[in-house]
């Protein structure tokens, strides 16, 4: 199994506009639907396989997700979450249009293994000389990284990613980092069935990172 930080680090080796380039290049309507969802919310591939509900309410685009990695006995994960996204992004515009075509509601599904395979193939096609390939999890790590670099509250990040605890987000990017992806996540609001548990470990980690950033800037 890959180290949890490996995908985060690999984002730095992808083309700066990799999300836009991949999305533009896809001709298959079914795959384009799936990649639009990944670009918009960074859901897990297993959640995409279950089906993502796309709806328009009061002219706002909402994606409903049934969570993966959920265990009611241990309190792990969020069973369901709703995410309001920026519909001015290329994938936001696309999903808004698709939902309107389907009388304001539709469900998008794609096989978890299949979508990553298609993305790796597309990555090789677009960037044959790059060793780092785009996968479904690249989108999830991008959303987490961008939200952190944008200074979004830990609770909002946890809700977006489907975490029960705000400490789980520590493998996605770093607050106060390079800021290269600041403002690019497109998440307006996230709502979950269960409240997010706050971890004191996150406070300690954020304090440590703040000191490190300050020291490195001296």
Language model region names:
Residues 1-17, 72-87:
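DNA breakage-rejoining catalytic core of tyrosine-based enzymes
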Residues 12-45:
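Basic, Lys/Arg- and aromatic-enriched nucleic-acid-binding interface segment
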Residues 35, 141-149:
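Short, amphipathic alpha-helical "recognition" segments used to contact nucleic acids or chromatin
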Residues 48, 134, 144, 151-163:
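Active-site-proximal segment of tyrosine recombinases
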Residues 50-93:
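Conserved tyrosine-mediated DNA breakage-rejoining catalytic core shared by Y-recombinases
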Residues 86-132, 137-138:
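Active-site/catalytic core of tyrosine-dependent DNA strand-transfer enzymes
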Residues 161-189:
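Catalytic-site neighborhood detector that most strongly recognizes the C-terminal catalytic loop/helix
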Residues 186-218:
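C-terminal secondary-structure termini that scaffold catalytic or DNA-interacting sites
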């Amino acid at each position: 199994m890959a180290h949890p930080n490996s995908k985060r680090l690999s984002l730095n080796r992808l083309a700066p506009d990799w999300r836009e380039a991949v999305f533009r290049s896809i001709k298959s309507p079914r795959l384009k639907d799936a990649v639009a969802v990944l670009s918009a919310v960074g859901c897990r591939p297993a959640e995409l396989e279950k089906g993502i509900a796309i709806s328009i309410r009061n002219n706002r685009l909402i994606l409903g997700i049934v969570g993966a990695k959920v265990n009611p006995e241990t309190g792990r994960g969020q069973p369901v979450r709703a995410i309001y996204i920026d519909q001015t992004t290329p994938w936001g515009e696309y999903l808004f249009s698709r939902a309107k075509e389907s009388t304001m509601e539709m469900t998008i599904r794609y096989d978890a293994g299949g979508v990553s395979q298609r993305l790796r193939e597309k990555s090789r096609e677009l960037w044959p000389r790059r060793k780092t390939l785009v996968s479904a999890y690249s989108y999830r790590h991008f959303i987490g990284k961008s939200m952190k670099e944008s200074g979004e509250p830990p609770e909002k990040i946890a809700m977006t990613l489907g975490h029960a605890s705000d400490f789980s987000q520590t493998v996605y990017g770093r607050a106060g980092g390079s800021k290269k992806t600041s403002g690019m996540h497109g998440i307006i609001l996230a709502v979950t069935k269960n409240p997010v548990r706050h971890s004191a470990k996150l406070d300690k980690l954020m304090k440590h990172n703040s000191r490190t950033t300050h020291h490195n800037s001296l």
